[in-house]
């Protein structure tokens, strides 16, 4: 039986492959700043903007839609980590956005939903 970590890791791999296939450059995985983490840091090739991605994976619908589990506290943590990444890479003020990739693993082919500009930075 797959553990929660296994399911999450598989979802992140699927999300990264999906984004790569859509023209995103994957810059970092599981980037940590302080105690905050961003699952994927990307750069959209066409627009040149940084994209901070939260991946939510579910193996069933018992806990609701994956994207519905991103709380205000989680959004704040993602924003903190994103600011840290931009600072560390000398990119403060660069165009950036927050996306969510929801992955459903229900036994058949994975279902992937990509929500661009899923929320705004405070």
From Swiss-Prot:
InterPro entries: Restrct_endonuc-II-like (IPR011335), tRNA_endonuc-like_dom_sf (IPR011856), UPF0102_YraN-like (IPR003509). One of its GO terms (molecular function) is nucleic acid binding. It comes from the Bacteria. Belongs to the UPF0102 family. This is UPF0102 protein SRU_1822.
